[in-house]
Swiss-Prot record:
Family: Belongs to the radical SAM superfamily. RlmN family.
Required co-factors: [4Fe-4S] cluster
Species name: Wolinella succinogenes (strain ATCC 29543 / DSM 1740 / CCUG 13145 / JCM 31913 / LMG 7466 / NCTC 11488 / FDC 602W) (Vibrio succinogenes)
Catalyses which reaction(s): adenosine(2503) in 23S rRNA + 2 reduced [2Fe-2S]-[ferredoxin] + 2 S-adenosyl-L-methionine = 2-methyladenosine(2503) in 23S rRNA + 5'-deoxyadenosine + L-methionine + 2 oxidized [2Fe-2S]-[ferredoxin] + S-adenosyl-L-homocysteine; adenosine(37) in tRNA + 2 reduced [2Fe-2S]-[ferredoxin] + 2 S-adenosyl-L-methionine = 2-methyladenosine(37) in tRNA + 5'-deoxyadenosine + L-methionine + 2 oxidized [2Fe-2S]-[ferredoxin] + S-adenosyl-L-homocysteine
Residues that coordinate or bind [4Fe-4S] cluster: C119, C123, C126
EC number: 2.1.1.192
One GO-annotated biological process of the protein: tRNA methylation
InterPro entries in alphabetical order: Aldolase_TIM, Elp3/MiaA/NifB-like_rSAM, Methyltransferase_A, RlmN_N, RNA_MTrfase_RlmN, rRNA_lsu_MTrfase_RlmN/Cfr, rSAM
Protein name: Dual-specificity RNA methyltransferase RlmN
């Protein structure tokens, strides 16, 4: 059985005849969020039968939802082969102008999606790394995270959302399926999520950053840097042995960036590890000449971790050092702490519950 969400509109046009039926199917999948082919009444009976026979829109399903006090929602998905992965919906307030020029408060949504079941990178601070790598998600398994979260939260197809490939897994390690998912999500007759609203967060596979840049898709780039010297970064991210800081920075310098955008450098701040002024000074020098923004992230403690959450005063001082010298720097607002929103934590929680139940 084939996953219907694996295909672009053009690919479905080649599979369905006449081709205009593919556009109708896309409307049902991505505008009506319909998963049962038999309910797609403007498709012929013959096409509905073919779709039911050869394809499925329900190979992946949501098996758990947790809601945070701050409005964040975390979902656990289960694949056809019994594997689980996660996605998170973040709801934030924003101020914008209405048609009469008045400033009004609204809401914006960001969906944090997974690209793999588990991860190969093995970051020492990451909860997902504890479970190792299982397999890549297909393009359809990536796409379905957005479809499901929009449907479950009654978000209209035209409601703009931002997508960050920052959940379980290293997106650039699943390159072909990632690119296919981006193309499906940005399809004008589908969800129509502009590539400018899609951010790929990578631990820094330098050759894949170059390859992504060569495609010039218009996506945004975020680098999980977390350290400013190779010795510490290798301790935190073992993959740094293969792709050191210099190679990553060089690849970023060649990456095509929209004139109104910046490369995001994510910096997970860990108490007593990388929260000092010397690190801030080195980071400033490292990013010199790059149109960039630094996003400071509080380390989110989890069971068994050797690291601790930094002091707020240290975060503020780090930010001030950078901003005082002209580097745009923000402190990420913590979301979903009460529901263990860090990637991999809900999956691990469910596995533990199941193991306890089987004793």
């Amino acid at each position: 059985m084939l996953n219907i969400y694996d295909y672009t509109l053009e690919e479905l046009k080649r599979r369905l005849h006449p081709p205009f039926r593919a556009k109708q199917l896309y409307h049902w999948l991505y505008h009506r969020y319909e998963e049962e082919f038999e309910k797609m009444h403007n498709l012929s009976k013959e096409i509905r039968q073919k779709l039911t026979q050869d394809y499925s829109a329900t190979l992946t399903k949501v098996v758990r939802e947790e809601v945070s006090e701050d409005g964040s929602r975390k979902y656990l998905f289960q694949t056809h082969d019994g594997l689980t992965y996660e996605a998170v919906l973040l709801k934030m307030k924003e101020k914008k102008e209405d048609e009469e020029g008045r400033i009004v408060e609204g809401e914006k949504y960001t969906i944090c999606v997974s690209s793999q079941v588990g991860c190969k990178v093995g970051c020492s601070f990451c909860f997902t790394a504890k479970g190792g790598f299982v397999r890549n998600l297909s393009a359809g398994e990536i796409v379905y995270q957005i479809v499901a979260l929009k449907r479950l939260n009654a978000l209209a197809p035209e409601k703009r959302v931002n997508i960050v490939y920052m959940g379980m897994g290293e997106p650039l390690d699943n390159f072909e399926n990632l690119i296919q998912a981006i193309r499906i999500l940005s399809e004008l007759d589908g969800l129509s999520i502009s590539t400018k609203r899609q951010t790929i967060s990578t631990s820094g596979i330098a050759p894949k950053i170059e390859k992504l840049g060569a495609l010039d898709l218009g996506v945004q780039l975020a680098i999980s840097l977390h350290a400013v010297d190779d010795e510490l970064r290798t301790r935190l991210i073992p993959m740094n042995k293969a792709y050191n800081i210099a190679s990553i920075i060089e690849a970023v310098r060649r990456f095509p960036i929209d004139s109104r955008k910046r490369v995001m450098f994510e910096y997970l701040v860990i108490k007593g590890v990388n929260d000092d002024e010397k690190s801030a000074k080195t980071l400033l020098k490292l990013l010199n000449g790059i149109k960039s923004k630094v996003n400071l992230i509080y380390f989110n403690p989890h069971e068994g971790s050797e690291f601790e959450r930094p002091l707020e005063s240290k975060m503020v001082a780090f930010q001030k050092y950078l901003t005082d010298r002209g580097l745009l720097c923000t402190i990420r607002e913590s979301k979903g702490i009460d529901i263990s929103a860090a990637c991999g934590q809900l999956r691990e929680k469910i596995i533990k519950e199941e193991n306890c139940g089987n004793r």
